[in-house]
């Protein structure tokens, strides 16, 4: 039976940590664990998901819930409430709902203070890991037979009815998702006709849509590594770009760090033209993936082919000219003397940057894509290297299992992010003493996860921003600082500092708060906006050379309403408690940031949310940031327009329910059937409450509160509904804790600020 292990290293000599592995979450298989009833419950959950997999594509994290239910048994003695259409929402009903929800949600808190959960969703992550482990000969070393079995389960479970696989679990079939998933299943031991016809259906989808030559550029890269696509069918990824002077706008050090850190090892692997061993499976795949014999494929033509199902960001003409020039003239010169000397120097430079990233994230790396690419680059450099051995155990930091199988997550978790939001949600309910132990544990996690040092060496040499005082998205061992994570961590720390330490523990030291404020203010761009990990270092026109057909806005670190709003909120909260610290700088920062938020509001009153679905999320941040900066409904046209927008989207039944298509198409789209979503409803309620909606017309808030109460399950939780996170406009990702955090937060604010106002 599978067991979740939290904050453990297992005595592995190849694991490094800064803080005793706080936040680490790893699933292990114990063949002796589980009694017959537990094993039967797990199998029932798996069958249940498989039976409904085309209707409900998101797991409910039932394996984790079963484990916590056994470890932290809870008998709810508060009756569940369902309100009839004619019934009004009462304070008693809301209080009952909140107590039941927080009591249940608290049982899922790990002993180190964070809330573990599924952060999966993208389907293109696991194939990179499988291919890397296969070509390096480490597949069976890194992944047990049970791991491989659960990965196969996951890949089969998320096959679409047409036979293909999507970019993410709720997406339509794409060549990127289909070809890579099919290949992964073959490498994991599935035959061409396995899976009760599933493999045959998958292969048919691939061939019916032109074959693997139509896969996206990232897919071409992975298939070339494996040996089932020729490197000449790839547009160049020249490592020499790392030798350019930094003042050039196209220098990779000026790019968004996720883009930079993915193309960094890609440069190395492309520069080496590495191809894995040609095994019998590879020869079979060369026959299975193409409409014509492998030796007859037109690789030059294949360079720019992309299936229409995958094409979110079509290449502009300038890109076609650039790739053709590099392919036909520059690359041939780099493969012979004297160009090959320059290539060797470039590859050496790239490898230095790869090692710096690995060492400063304890071999977790910034994300799952560069994690496996860096691991492969280390193996290519030296198959017996210490670096490769240090990479292997960190593979498990990215793997998560639920009733749908084992997936690769979009990060090593969302630990700090979810914990900071949870603290704010529980404090908003006013039930602080009742849930003091929960807050105290969470406080401990927040304190232990703050980044206390900058990365070593000359930061400019490694193109790194300062880190000291920041909070990361997940764990201190990961350590990459992020503006909004720093802001949310700081907000949570400040809230907890106002509560008796007898209840929540000792507050974060003042000097560490000062460090956090210093780091946070360092993120402000000249236009007042805040980007994610770093300042915006180059120009938006660089998006013209975005080679990833599947994603939008990846080349530079753009400023976002979410990051900017979070910074305003944190600085405002800090200023109230420490009014004398850098007062004029903080005031100027808040003023410029608020103007930036007003400047990017859409004409309909909304803000586009870039990190969750979508306009309800962005508009919550827009409103909350402006209110924190001192704007009100009366003095701010932007807030008035935002309220009009949100009220216009409330469903006839009450509540809000926004589809991921809003993110993809950038047009507000309701869920199919105009169903409410608990998380969207929570965001909209929080925005309207902050904007003073209760003083004008509380009825929309009463209706929304009733929706949330009636969505609540018998066990106190809110349901897992459609996927709610997003990145780069087109790929969805799971934020599994949101289902409980935001209904709790919204009902808490509603109870304190709407119902109390009515009295």
From Swiss-Prot:
The active site is at residue 484. The keyword Kinase does not apply. It is an enzyme of class 5 (isomerase). Belongs to the terpene cyclase/mutase family. It comes from Oryza sativa subsp. japonica (Rice). One of its GO terms (biological process) is triterpenoid biosynthetic process. This is Cycloartenol synthase. It catalyses: (S)-2,3-epoxysqualene = cycloartenol. Keywords: Isomerase, Repeat. One of its GO terms (molecular function) is cycloartenol synthase activity. Converts oxidosqualene ((3S)-2,3-epoxy-2,3-dihydrosqualene) to cycloartenol. Pfam families: SQHop_cyclase_C (PF13243), SQHop_cyclase_N (PF13249). PFTB repeats lie at residues 148-189, 513-558, 590-630, 639-680. It comes from the Eukaryota. Its EC number is 5.4.99.8. GO terms for cellular component: lipid droplet. Transmembrane segments: none annotated.
């Amino acid at each position: 039976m599978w067991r979740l292990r939290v904050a453990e290293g297992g005595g592995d000599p190849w694991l490094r940590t800064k803080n005793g592995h706080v936040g680490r979450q790893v699933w292990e298989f114990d063949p002796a664990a589980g009694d017959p009833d537990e094993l039967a419950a797990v199998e029932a959950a798996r069958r249940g998901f498989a039976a409904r997999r085309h209707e409900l594509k998101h797991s409910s994290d039932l394996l984790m819930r079963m484990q916590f239910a056994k470890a932290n048994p809870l008998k709810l003695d508060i009756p569940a409430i369902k309100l009839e259409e004619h019934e009004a929402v009462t304070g008693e009903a809301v209080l009952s709902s909140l107590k039941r929800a927080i009591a249940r949600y608290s049982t899922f808190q790990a002993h180190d203070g964070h809330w573990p959960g599924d952060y999966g969703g993208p389907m293109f992550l696991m194939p990179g890991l499988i291919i890397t482990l296969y070509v390096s000969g480490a597949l069976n070393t890194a992944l047990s037979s049970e791991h491989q079995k659960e990965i196969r389960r996951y890949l089969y479970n998320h096959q679409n009815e047409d036979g293909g696989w999507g970019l993410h679990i709720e997406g339509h079939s794409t060549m990127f998702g289909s070809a890579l998933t099919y290949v992964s299943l073959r490498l994991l031991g599935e035959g061409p006709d396995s899976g009760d016809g599933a493999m045959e259906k998958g292969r048919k989808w691939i061939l019916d849509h032109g074959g693997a030559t139509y896969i996206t550029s990232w897919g071409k890269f992975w298939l070339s590594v494996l040996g089932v696509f020729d490197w000449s069918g790839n547009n160049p990824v020249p490592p020499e770009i790392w030798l350019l002077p930094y003042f050039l706008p196209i220098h990779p050090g000026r790019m968004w760090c996720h883009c930079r850190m993915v193309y960094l090892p890609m440069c190395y692997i492309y520069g080496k033209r590495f191809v894995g061993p040609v095994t019998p499976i590879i020869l079979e795949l060369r026959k299975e993936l193409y409409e014509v014999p492998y030796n007859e494929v037109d690789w030059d033509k294949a360079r720019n082919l992309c299936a229409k199902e995958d094409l979110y960001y079509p290449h502009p003409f300038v890109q076609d000219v650039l790739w053709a020039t590099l392919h036909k003239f520059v690359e041939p010169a780099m493969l012979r003397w004297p160009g090959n000397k320059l290539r060797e120097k470039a590859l050496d430079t790239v490898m230095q940057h790869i090692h710096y990233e690995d060492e400063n994230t304890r071999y977790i790396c910034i994300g799952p894509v560069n994690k496996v690419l860096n691991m492969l680059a280390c193996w290519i450099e030296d198959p017996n290297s210490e670096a490769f051995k240090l990479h292997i155990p960190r593979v498990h930091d990215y793997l998560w299992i639920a009733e749908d199988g084992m997936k690769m997550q979009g990060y090593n978790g969302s630990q700090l992010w979810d914990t900071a939001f949870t603290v704010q949600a529980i404090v908003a309910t006013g039930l602080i003493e009742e849930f003091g132990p929960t807050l105290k544990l969470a406080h401990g996690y927040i304190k232990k996860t703050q980044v206390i040092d900058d990365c070593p060496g000359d930061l400019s040499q490694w193109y790194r921003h300062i880190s000291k005082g920041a909070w990361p998205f997940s764990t201190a061992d990961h350590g990459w600082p992020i503006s909004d994570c720093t802001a949310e961590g700081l907000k949570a720390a400040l809230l907890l500092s106002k509560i008796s330490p007898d209840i929540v523990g000792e507050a974060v030291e003042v000097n560490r708060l000062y460090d956090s404020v210093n780091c946070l203010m360092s993120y402000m761009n000249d236009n007042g906006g805040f980007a994610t990990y770093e300042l915006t270092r180059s120009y938006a026109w660089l998006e013209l050379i975005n080679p990833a057909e599947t994603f939008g806005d990846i080349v530079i670190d753009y400023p976002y309403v979410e990051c900017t709003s979070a910074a305003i909120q944190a600085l405002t909260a800090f200023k109230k408690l420490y009014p004398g610290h850098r007062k004029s700088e903080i005031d100027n920062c808040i003023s410029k940031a608020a103007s930036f938020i007003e400047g990017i509001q859409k004409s309909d009153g909304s803000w586009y949310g870039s990190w969750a679905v979508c306009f309800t999320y962005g508009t919550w941040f827009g409103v909350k940031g402006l209110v924190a900066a001192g704007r009100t409904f009366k003095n701010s046209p932007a807030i008035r327009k935002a309220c009009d927008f949100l009220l216009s989207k409330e469903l006839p039944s009450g509540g809000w329910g926004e589809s991921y298509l809003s993110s993809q198409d950038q047009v507000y789209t309701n869920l199919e059937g105009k169903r409410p979503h608990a998380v969207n409803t929570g965001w909209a309620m929080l925005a309207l409450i902050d904007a003073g909606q209760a003083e004008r017309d509380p009825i929309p808030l009463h209706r929304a509160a009733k929706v949330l109460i009636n969505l609540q399950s018998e066990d106190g939780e809110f349901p897992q509904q459609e996927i709610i996170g997003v990145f780069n406009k087109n790929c969805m990702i799971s934020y599994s804790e949101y289902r409980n955090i935001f209904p709790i937060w919204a009902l808490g604010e509603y109870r304190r600020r709407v119902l109390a106002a009515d009295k």
